[in-house]
């Protein structure tokens, strides 16, 4: 008999199965639109279960050591194969044979050390080959000779000591050759002659310690348009030699950034005279001195970058010869910290006079003392001038500050971060073409009279945000009616409520920013006349009082008339009320920001006109209820909603509609699952609003009629049940009476028709009492004759028949009611029923009840279906306990017997 396996074997078998399942599920490639992404999956082999029609395969960041050609047979349509960041050490020629349409092959960051002549023999359609960051130290023979369509070859970050990549002419279509970060120390014609038929647009040799440029090295290349030698530690003399070697070449772009070019002499770029160089990058080269006429050899130059240097002096001939320069970057070019103004970098007058074609000048982040009368003289085509953080003592802008720009068609002027404190009248009067003026982030503190902007006839935007303080007047902007964008954020704005409004002269205004000014008082004419306004920023002010119904004169409708407004920001104003007509005129509004206020209950029709709203922000308010009557119109076409951090009341009345909406809409709702939480009731506190169960909250409107009908039916049913329970006997009794009336029963009350005054119904056990008390009455009054069963029933007649006949011949029927009668079966089943029937046929008071005992009404009804309420009071008698009251009882009985059988 076999022994059972130990428990730990089962345990480890289960763990192994679980690990295999988890591993297989984790190693799943993502396939979308013929692109397979298998990156970061720790793959050791090529997946074999991908669609055969994929054109892009990403295998980066795995553990591949080979790219077996057989594994790519099923993926023959691949055009891009990325195998970067693996451990591939060898490429097999058959790879491209199985991938005939391959155009881009990326094998960067692998362990490839050698390339044979056969490696790429079948890669004839390859256009890009990336082999950067491998271990290739030398290229032997001609591994790239068959790559006739190759456009880009990247061999950077290898250990190459030479630029020689082949022994014969090849790579005739190559445009980019990247050899940066290698160990190349010299450039010779023999090492570059394989490019004799190539037209290189970019030769990247940066971060190589090149110490020699052999004669004719660049002429060995068929055509060279761009050369990068950044971070090559080129000295001034080596740079001059480089330029000589570039003479008479097709060079257009030359980048020499991050070198050791501390001085540029008159001869440094002389070798470039016979070129068409258009772009020169000399940034981060520790440049201090530029001799006169240094750039005289570059008449075709259009772009010059000198940023991040330490130039001491710019003379009137520093830029001589740059007659075609269009873009000049001098950012951080003159930076040198100094306490003394005399030792600050110096710019002579007329330094830019030679730059007749200059359109863009960037002089940001420098340390100039000020602007002289002729600093920018000669810039007759300048359109963009940035002087941000450029001056150490430019405190006041006078009418002479920009005199040197009088002849320039300047469109943009950036003066931010210069500690400017005052703008004098006519300071910009020379800049009649200016469209954008940026004065932000300064220390301006003054009253704006309007003369500051005199002469800005074409101004479109004025940026004054983040200054010390600005006091407005009625005429503050009368000189700039063309203004379309006005930024006044965080300027401690004063006198905003002046009348007429300071913004009334701006009929073309499209954007107005008045945020972060603690504005507390405005009038309803503040924005009057701004019919073209599209964007209004009023956040971070104190406008809450203006919209209160308790405000003297009522809410201030300062938004009226803005029929073209599209974006409105009213966040952080302390609003706790919104007038019902606050947004009435804003029919084209696309975005409203009311976040970080104190709003709780909004008027029902406040958003009725905002049917085009796309974005609504109400975050961090006190909103508890989101109902359709308020938010329905606003949510109709909404694309973005932000109502985070509101204390939602999670009840059917408050958010049922909202929950249904957010669970069915395609609107982008920020952080819905985390920051839309219930606050009340307590059992839902902290519960996500989107998970609130609305099934008990079905809209009652469609079922209201049904509810009312059901309720009425239920109430009627309960009423009938109670009526039957308490008065059913009465209804039954009168129903029977009515039926017999309808059937034509007539009242019979003729004395001669009856033989007996009354028929006495009693229990058999009570016969002695009946005989004892009724016989003496007959003896006393001979007109009274009672029908007693023991005495008056005919012999030989059936008892039941005798009872019927006797009842019919009796004028009245007397019930002697005792406990015995209630238990007597004959009385219960026949006598009482027949007597009641007779009473109904004759009339309603032909029955007399004599109670010998106290019998509750419910017992009487239960046993005999009789109730005291069915009879007149004189027909209900109680046998007296006291003997002296017996005569009175007899008198009452005679009265009852003598009463006429009238209708009850």
UniProtKB/Swiss-Prot annotation:
GO BP term, example: inflammatory response
LRR repeats: 53-74, 77-98, 101-122, 125-146, 149-170, 173-196, 199-220, 223-245, 250-271, 276-297, 300-321, 324-345, 357-378, 381-401, 409-430, 433-455, 466-487, 508-529, 532-553, 564-585, 588-609, 612-633
UniProt xrefs under Pfam families: LRR_6 (PF13516), LRR_8 (PF13855), TIR (PF01582), Tlr3_TMD (PF17968)
Membrane topology of the entry: Single-pass type I membrane protein
Annotated keywords: Disulfide bond, Endoplasmic reticulum, Endosome, Glycoprotein, Immunity, Inflammatory response, Innate immunity, Isopeptide bond, Leucine-rich repeat, Membrane, Phosphoprotein, Receptor, Repeat, RNA-binding, Signal, Transmembrane, Transmembrane helix, Ubl conjugation
Compartments where located: Endoplasmic reticulum membrane; Endosome membrane; Early endosome
Post-translational modification (record): Ubiquitinated by TRIM3; leading to recognition and sorting of polyubiquitinated TLR3 by the ESCRT complexes. Ubiquitinated by ZNRF1 via 'Lys-63'-linked ubiquitin chains; leading to TLR3 lysosomal trafficking and degradation.
Glycosylation sites: 53, 58, 71, 125, 197, 248, 253, 276, 292, 399, 414, 637, 663, 668
Span of domain LRRCT: 646-699
Organism domain of life: Eukaryota
Record SMART domains: LRR_SD22, LRR_TYP, LRRCT, TIR
Main localisation: endoplasmic reticulum
Domain-level remarks: ds-RNA binding is mediated by LRR 1 to 3, and LRR 17 to 18.
Subunit structure: Monomer and homodimer; dimerization is triggered by ligand-binding and is required for TLR3 signaling. Interacts (via transmembrane domain) with UNC93B1. Interacts with TICAM1 (via the TIR domain) in response to poly(I:C) and this interaction is enhanced the presence of WDFY1. Interacts with SRC; upon binding of double-stranded RNA. The tyrosine-phosphorylated form (via TIR domain) interacts with WDFY1 (via WD repeat 2) in response to poly(I:C).
Functional description taken from the UniProt entry: Key component of innate and adaptive immunity. TLRs (Toll-like receptors) control host immune response against pathogens through recognition of molecular patterns specific to microorganisms. TLR3 is a nucleotide-sensing TLR which is activated by double-stranded RNA, a sign of viral infection. Acts via the adapter TRIF/TICAM1, leading to NF-kappa-B activation, cytokine secretion and the inflammatory response.
Protein name: Toll-like receptor 3
Organism of origin: Boselaphus tragocamelus
């Amino acid at each position: 008999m076999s022994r059972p396996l130990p428990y730990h074997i089962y345990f480890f078998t289960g763990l192994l199965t679980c690990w295999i399942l988890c591993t297989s599920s984790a190693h799943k490639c993502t396939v979308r639109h013929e692109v397979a992404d298998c990156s970061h999956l720790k793959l050791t082999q090529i997946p074999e279960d991908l669609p055969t029609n994929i054109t892009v395969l990403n295998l980066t960041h795995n553990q591949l050591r080979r790219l077996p050609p057989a594994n790519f047979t099923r993926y023959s349509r691949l055009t891009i194969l990325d195998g970067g960041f693996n451990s591939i050490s060898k490429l097999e020629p058959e790879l491209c044979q199985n991938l005939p349409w391959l155009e881009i092959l990326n094998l960067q960051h692998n362990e490839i050390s050698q390339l044979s002549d056969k490696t790429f023999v079948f890669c004839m359609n390859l256009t890009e080959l990336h082999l950067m960051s491998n271990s290739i130290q030398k290229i032997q023979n001609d591994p790239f000779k068959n790559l006739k369509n190759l456009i880009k070859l990247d061999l950077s970050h290898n250990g190459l000591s030479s630029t020689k990549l082949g022994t014969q002419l090849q790579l005739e279509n190559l445009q980019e050759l990247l050899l940066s970060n290698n160990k190349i120390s010299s450039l010779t014609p023999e090492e570059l002659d394989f490019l004799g038929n190539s037209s290189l647009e970019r030769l990247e040799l940066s971060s190589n310690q090149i110490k020699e440029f052999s004669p004719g090295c660049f002429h060995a290349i068929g055509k060279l348009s761009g050369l990068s030698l950044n971070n090559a530690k080129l000295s001034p003399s080596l740079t001059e030699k480089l330029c000589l070697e570039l003479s008479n070449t097709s060079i257009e772009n030359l980048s020499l950034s991050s070198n050791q070019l501390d001085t540029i002499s008159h001869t440094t770029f002389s070798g470039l005279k016979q070129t068409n160089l258009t772009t020169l990058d000399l940034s981060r080269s520790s440049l201090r001195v530029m001799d006169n006429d240094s750039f005289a050899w570059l008449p075709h130059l259009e772009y010059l970058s000198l940023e991040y240097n330490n130039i001491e002096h710019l003379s009137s001939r520093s830029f001589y010869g740059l007659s075609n320069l269009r873009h000049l970057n001098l950012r951080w070019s003159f930076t040198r910290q100094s306490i003394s103004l005399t030792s600050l970098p110096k710019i002579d007058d007329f330094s830019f006079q030679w730059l007749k074609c200059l359109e863009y000048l960037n002089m940001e982040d420098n340390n100039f003392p000020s602007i002289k009368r002729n600093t920018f003289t000669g810039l007759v085509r300048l359109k963009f001038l940035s002087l941000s953080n450029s001056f150490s003592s430019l405190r006041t802008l006078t009418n002479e500050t920009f005199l040197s720009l009088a002849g320039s068609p300047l469109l943009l002027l950036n003066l931010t971060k210069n500690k400017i404190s005052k703008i004098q009248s006519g300071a910009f009067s020379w800049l009649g073409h200016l469209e954008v003026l940026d004065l932000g982030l300064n220390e301006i503190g003054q009253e704006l009279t309007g003369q500051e902007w005199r002469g800005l006839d074409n101004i479109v935007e004025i940026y004054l945000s983040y200054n010390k303080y600005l006091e407005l007047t009625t005429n503050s902007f009368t000189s700039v009616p063309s203004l379309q964008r006005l930024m006044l954020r965080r300027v401690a704005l004063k006198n905003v409520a002046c009348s007429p409004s300071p913004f009334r002269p701006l009929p073309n205004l499209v954007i107005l920013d008045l945020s972060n000014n603690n504005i507390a008082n405005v009038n309803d004419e503040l924005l009057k006349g701004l019919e073209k306004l599209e964007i209004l920023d009023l956040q971070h002010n104190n406008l809450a009082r203006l919209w209160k119904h308790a405000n003297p004169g009522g809410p201030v409708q300062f938004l009226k008339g803005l029929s073209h407004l599209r974006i409105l920001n009213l966040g952080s104003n302390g609003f706790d009320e919104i007038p019902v007509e606050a947004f009435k005129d804003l029919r084209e509004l696309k975005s409203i920001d009311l976040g970080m206020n104190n709003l709780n209950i909004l008027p029902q029709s406040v958003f009725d006109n905002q049917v085009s709203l796309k974005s609504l922000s109400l975050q961090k308010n006190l909103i508890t209820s989101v109902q359709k009557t308020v938010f329905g119109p606003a949510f109709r076409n909404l694309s973005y909603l932000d109502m985070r951090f509101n204390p939602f009341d999670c009840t059917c009345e408050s958010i049922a509609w909202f929950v249904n909406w957010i669970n069915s809409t395609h609107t982008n709702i920020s952080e819905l699952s985390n920051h839309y939480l219930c606050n009340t009731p307590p059992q839902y506190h902290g519960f996500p609003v989107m998970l609130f169960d609305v099934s008990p909250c079905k809209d009652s409107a469609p079922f209201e009629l049904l509810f009312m009908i059901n309720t009425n039916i239920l109430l009627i049913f309960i009423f009938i049940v109670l009526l039957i329970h308490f008065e059913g006997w009465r209804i039954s009794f009168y129903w029977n009476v009515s039926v017999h009336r309808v059937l034509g029963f007539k009242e019979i009350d003729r004395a001669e028709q009856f033989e007996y005054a009354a028929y006495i119904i009693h229990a058999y056990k009570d016969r002695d009492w009946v005989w004892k008390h009724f016989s003496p009455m007959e003896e006393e009054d001979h007109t009274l004759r009672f029908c007693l069963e023991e005495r008056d029933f005919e012999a030989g007649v059936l008892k039941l028949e005798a009872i019927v006949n006797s009842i019919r011949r009796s004028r009245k029927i007397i019930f002697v009611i005792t406990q015995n009668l209630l238990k007597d079966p004959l009385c219960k089943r026949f006598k009482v029923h027949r007597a009641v029937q007779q009473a109904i046929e004759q009339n309603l008071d032909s029955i007399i009840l004599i109670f010998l005992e106290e019998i509750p009404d419910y017992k009487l009804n239960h046993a005999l279906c009789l109730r005291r309420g069915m009879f007149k009071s004189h027909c209900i008698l109680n046998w007296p306990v006291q003997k002296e009251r017996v005569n009175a009882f007899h008198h009452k009985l005679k009265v009852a017997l003598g009463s006429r059988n009238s209708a009850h």
